[in-house]
Swiss-Prot record:
Keywords: Aspartyl protease, Hydrolase, Protease. InterPro entries: Pept_HybD-like_dom_sf, Peptidase_A31. Pfam families: HycI. It comes from the Bacteria. SUPFAM superfamilies: HybD-like (SSF53163). One of its GO terms (molecular function) is enzyme activator activity. This is Protein HydD. Belongs to the peptidase A31 family. GO terms for biological process: protein processing. PANTHER family: HYDROGENASE 1 MATURATION PROTEASE, HYDROGENASE 2 MATURATION PROTEASE. The keyword Hydrolase applies. Coiled coil: none annotated.
Length: 159
């Protein structure tokens, strides 16, 4: 959520491909019509990886998920996996890249702040997304320089 908002605030995307940055939140299966409306999707999300450390970043094709990715974390992670699989079973899944980070578990406390590890990982994730978009021919212009720590407390308002 925070990284998608950071991308919306800090960058303008132009070129032969339309880029929409959408905070899917916890909409899970409600995202299926949205996902199927695109030719290509990049999902930015939390992942669980056996033996991984908080803040580790993974970048992979959904049709070639690394063996260390277990999808055993939060209900949200499982819902995203189910959403992508349901879309795939229907034959409507476009190519999907996933940029994932191992999160810090916050327990029962609701918070919009990021752990230090995930905040640091968000810089790597931002670079991965931007580099990949450029590889796809998207022209990127930086229009602001907000940090993830500035964005996070306001993410609930949307951007």
């Amino acid at each position: 959520m925070h990284l998608s908002n950071l991308l919306k605030v800090n960058y303008r995307f132009e070129g032969p491909h339309q880029v929409d940055v959408i905070d899917g939140g916890t909409l899970a299966q409600l995202l299926i019509p949205l996902i199927t409306s695109y030719d290509y999707v990049i999902v930015i999300d939390c992942v669980d990886a056996g033996g991984g450390k908080i803040g580790e970043v993974y970048f992979f094709d959904f049709d070639n998920v690394p063996n260390v990715i277990t999808w055993q974390g939060s209900a949200h992670e499982v819902e995203m996996l189910q959403t992508l699989r349901m879309t795939e079973v229907n034959g409507d899944l476009p190519p999907v890249k996933i940029v994932g980070v191992i999160p810090s578990i916050i327990g029962s406390e609701t918070a919009f702040d990021l752990s230090k590890e995930v905040a640091e990982a968000s810089v790597t994730m931002e670079k991965i997304v931007l580099n990949h978009l450029q590889e796809l021919g998207v022209e990127i212009t930086r229009i602001d320089s907000k940090t993830i720590d500035e964005i996070a407390p306001l993410s609930y308002k949307g951007f």
